Amino acid sequence: MAEGSWSVARVAKLTAAGVQKNERHNERKNESYANMNVDLERSPLNVHFKDTGGLTYNEYFQKLIDEGKISTRGLRENATLFNEMIVDVNTKYFEERGGYEYARTFYEEAYRFACGIYGEENIISAVMHADEINKAVTEELGKPVYHYHLHIVAIPTVRKEIRWSKRCKDEALRGTVKEVINQVSHSKKWESKVPELDENGQVVRNEKGKTVFRKSYSVLQDKLFEHLTALSLIHISEPTRPRLIS
């Protein structure tokens, strides 16, 4: 990326109640956005790489439950059911490379990356916003400049084996796999398994001698960076990689 450019992928945790506010913003269901610099006349230019087919986010979630594709077994009432991943790049990066069309290609690939993490069916909505004006850059360049970014709302699931208990009457079945479910679980989905390394490439350990693992979102940033760089959608011109922040 050019000097001063940065990219970011951050993940927020959302409950069934909390996701409704995000839905209204992402899907432009509000009548006005006084503090968001949203130009509703440009909202038709927003790009959905995945939509709900007319359902609300919670209705889509319930549909997957009803179809037996996900499970909320054992979750508390106010549990995290959704993730919102926001992928963002500073405004000038796209403006210098063709603006809207370049951003659309960039974020389509970011969406494909997210499909690899969550599974496409578990992604409820993925929309690139093209209607939020960047007032500072607009003033600097003397023309309307819009800030392109991607909102992805997804369901974090992990594959879980349910085994027959020791109380099963059939001794041959005890301890064997009864069924495999896609369990909704933010904590398990984002449990880090990548060791932290020191400057010498050695595994970092805590005071008890246990391995210290990298923060999962840091790993996410690196993987997204590598994915987009391999497709030549991120260009490195300086000797160090772009600043990836969470």
Identify what each model region corresponds to.
Residues 1-237, 241:
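N-terminal nicking endonuclease/strand-transfer module with a His-rich metal-binding environment
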